[in-house]
């Protein structure tokens, strides 16, 4: 058992988040499972009831002010579309750092760690985010997305003045991946590419159709980054059996959003040809 708690904050995707925790537990043994939600959807977890009404602002506040519920040195923070996949790649070296996230290859190496949707955060970092006067005085509008706020906006301050240690890119590449094919196998993942890589067709359909049912975000899923990276993964991994579902799903979009998807794919001609031809 590791000195690590699984932490999830979820108010919309209870069933999918429950499944993601279950998948992670086949690969990793945490000391605690902390669920901050409006519903106690994971029996045996440490349930913290909350009912946010102010969207991402309150969500970020809960994430950065949860130290009182944590009895371990670190948390493994997860979303509904992230989980651990390779127990053999866990190493206690991860716990030498206050923050590890999925690599951002669109950033220079010194700023590339990284995505928060599957991340390790130390209690020290969480307490700093909650209690530091300088951070507290920053306008909340600058704190979203919260992982960019931590890893880009205030990274220098955290590193130099608070001695927060961010994992180097080489370590993060063994920990997780998010938007592109990983250079090697990883302990876990976050996002569409990993879902295509690790779920079979029926599971993928279940996750996406359930997300559409319980969250009014079909437009975001099928026209935004999630679907773009899913199609990229389908193409690269040669999982062509996903193509009928992709066409079915996009057929449910209205004309405006359908053309948004086509525009996104036109940014990469290979993906466009694969998807529409």
Describe each model-derived feature in a short phrase.
Residues 1-74, 257:
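N-terminal anchoring/stem segment of glycosyltransferases
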Residues 83-113:
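Conserved donor-nucleotide/metal-binding helix-loop-beta segment in metal-dependent transferases, i.e.
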Residues 241-252:
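Alpha-helical repeat scaffolds
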Residues 33, 80-81, 122:
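Generic structural signal for small/hydrophobic residues in well-ordered secondary structure
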Residues 258-277:
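TPR/TPR-like alpha-solenoid helical repeat scaffolds
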